[in-house]
Amino acid sequence: MSPIRAALFLGATALPAATGAQTAPVTVKPIVYTQRTLANGLRVFAIRDTSTPNVSVQVWYDVGSKDDPKNRSGFAHMFEHLMFKATRNLVPEQVDRLTEDVGGYNNASTNDDYTNYFEVVPANHLQRLLFAEADRMASLVVEPVSFASERDVVKEELRQRVLASPYGKLYSIYYPQLSYGVHPYARPGIGSLNDLQAASIDDVRAFHATYYRPDNAILVVSGNFNPMQLDRWIDGYFAPIAKPNRPIPRVTVAEPARTQAVARTVYEPNTPLPAVLVSYHVPPDRDADTPALTVLQAILATGESSRLYQSLVYRDQVAQSAAAFLDTKQSTGNLVAYAIVAGGKTVQQGETALKREIARLRTEPVTAAELAEAKNEILTQAIRQRETAEGKAFVLATSTIVDGDPDASQKQLEAVGRVTAADVRRVAAKYLGDRQSATIRYLPVESRPAGSASDAVPIAATVRVADLRAPADIPVVTPAPVGRRVMPPQPAAPIAAVLPQPVETRLVNGLRVVTVERHDLPIVTASLVASGGAATDPAGRAGASGLTSALLTKGTATRSATEIARAIESLGGSIESGSSRDGASIDVTVKSDQIAPAMAILADVAVHPAFKPDEIERARAQSIDAVNVEFKDPAQLARLVAARAVFGSAPYGAPAEGTPESLKAITRDDVQRSYRATWTPASATLLMVGDITPTAARALAERHFGGWRAIGPAGAAPVVAAAAEPRVVLVDMPDAGQAGVVVARPAITRTDARFYPLAVANTTLGGGFSSRLNQEIRIKRGLSYGAASSLSARRQGGVIEARTQTKNPTAPDVVAIIVEEMRKLGTAPAPAAELDTRKAVLVGGFGRAIETTAGIADILGDYLVQSVPLSELSRYTGAVQGVDPRAVQAAAAELLDPARASIVVVGDARQFADALRRRYPKLEVIPASSLNLDSPTLK
């Protein structure tokens, strides 16, 4: 199953509860929907849910990257971008105005088999979205200026996601190209720079006329709506779209079975650690073997009790990370296993270990415990997907397009419940033989032996690709004259959201217990939160809080790390521990029938961590490998350097994850001190969100945490020094595929009275697709795939940063645009209409977050570590909406002034250093190889 399919796997069957369950197992009801087909062939699905104030509108077209024309790889994906431009009645980017500017959002994606367009908006805007989707299906306008600009944006997306990202070429280029010899799945969906440049406007018009038609699409509406009114709107907007009198081209070629193993070795720049990827052909998603393969994948790679994690990462430590996914499609797909090799290990060791675990599936039966755990994990994934209207729509649409049956996911889940150990071994033997493998070894270019070269991994000459045959007499659509343009309908009366209400109590030992009831789905998120975090790390020990948090789930006085993972995952649940700048948390999500045994595990890891020396060394090695990977990513490294530039020697300046040097310096005593200072009942809060009552939550808290006693005083809040003087820093990363750009400056605490005006100012600057930065950098100039800004308001003063990635030569231009947009916000008042849309972005994002148990827990957890009262949950929307233009300008003038900002660029200095120095004579150039993030000077 593909990554998206794995996330959307859904059904109605209750799977057997794990041993020790306290209540009857939960059941998952099937998605209730209506279906009809219009005369023009458009299939319409409606899923009504009156518990939400939102609605999701989705149009999925049965055309994807496999349908890219000859010499036009990446075409379906580029066309996806163009669908957000003009139509006969909509101006460019008006879909964003209709969604983001009212508190919703929109997006789209291109898969090998389909292209989907999806929006979530307040339900009173449903009619407007139906109007817009029908208009771009029927009357897309393609003109030279927007076509050229969006083509440049797609090129930047390719550079950002593939060329500049460590391992980007492994997953996006080499994997598909080696996996297929005949089927057009071989071509990367992102395309190539040459093919993108060769595309023409006539190609675009022909593609739209060929595939973007009602009989090649489905419409899914999910959320709060009146069914009769919905039908009238659909009949009014979509039914008049004509069905073309010509067949739809289909890819019918079949990929032959692989009977001889293939392997390639490649060397790439900016590769922090070697990697290996092995793929095996599997049948189409609709095949009867897919449920057994889904269980196999879960046993192999889901959670820390999985075989790959236990063998490669935990026990033998040959991999920094290891995973597998089931990439099923309409036609032949793949099961893919991969590993990022640990520091000091070889790619050969990683490959041997991966293939050893695959072989075990063929030769040894899986255990009953592994089988039950995998099924429970799949069920929990299904429940979590149903938390939102959008998630339910994705399930239905994916099943319809990929499998040809809207009930396919439900049927597959029922079949998962019937999978046996013999089934798992059978499909492993059938599909995962040694001779059926395709292996890619991906190594740093520095490790290439003298005189050798990378193996070629081209698209095979035998791959069959069709020419794009333009239909005759394609109409050229032009924008309607202003006076004749049909305007979107007005929104209806808004539907009020029901805000969750936290209920608080406190145990005798001081532990605060907060419950938020949500009984619509049988799921609970429990989060134990405490103040502390990376800001409390001692000098020279950056990463201590993060390492301590990671170790909480790696062993207690009575359970080993493996036993903890198996215990929680056997319940179908997950457990994660981590830290932020200001706090730490342990989070459990589980079906509500398993909350009692899950709470016992949560309490054990919080109260009785062992911090065994061997676990510390294992976690240390994994953390060092992880930061080494991060240091090879231009965008990530730019943010780390910016933190040092802004805060200097203050605690917020040090990397929260640590550096290789600081992580090596951390001792067991440091870990124990960090734990004692952070985790005390009086300074911690237990959040319980979901299908549980306050009475039941308190009883569980008393049972499992009532005996918890502090073993040391709570840590004091760190003293944060004044921000450092602004700097302009260029980190030279030779051969970087893109430049990462960050402009950052100090911000305020979360409790500061200026928080809401600054939040609106930040969102105006860089929050969302319609923000000023994205308008100037992406939409108008095509210099980046996207530009954004963020406000991190913390307990001791935070940071505001504007950031993007761009091709190396344009980095100085992008810096200039960011600086100018920051300046303008403080020198002239923003129009009230613009601010209204930016407020809607904040309010809409908040509303979507509180639709899920994890989202509510995250918001409340942030409030707790930032000393914000939980009543903020109820006042957030009003506080945002009450901000006026004068307050925004005042906040921007004081807190966005670029004169107090540091500028950081990470990229290939040869291509832009001189231009940047002309603008900033005090430019500091630091080679990436000698960058020292442990030092405030960076040297």
Question: What are the language-model segments listed below?
Answer:
Residues 155-161, 253-267, 376-385, 590, ...:
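Short, conserved secondary-structure transition motifs
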Residues 18-45, 226-268, 275, 310, ...:
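Proteolytic maturation boundary segments
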Residues 135-144, 237-245, 356-366, 604-611, ...:
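A common structural junction motif
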Residues 208, 576, 675:
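Conserved, carboxylate-rich catalytic/transport cores that coordinate ions
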Residues 5-17:
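Bacterial N-terminal signal peptides
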Residues 45-47, 52-78, 92-137, 166-194, ...:
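M16 family metallopeptidases and their MPP-like homologs
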Residues 75-83, 296, 547-548, 761:
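Active-site His/Glu-centered metal-binding helix of metallohydrolases
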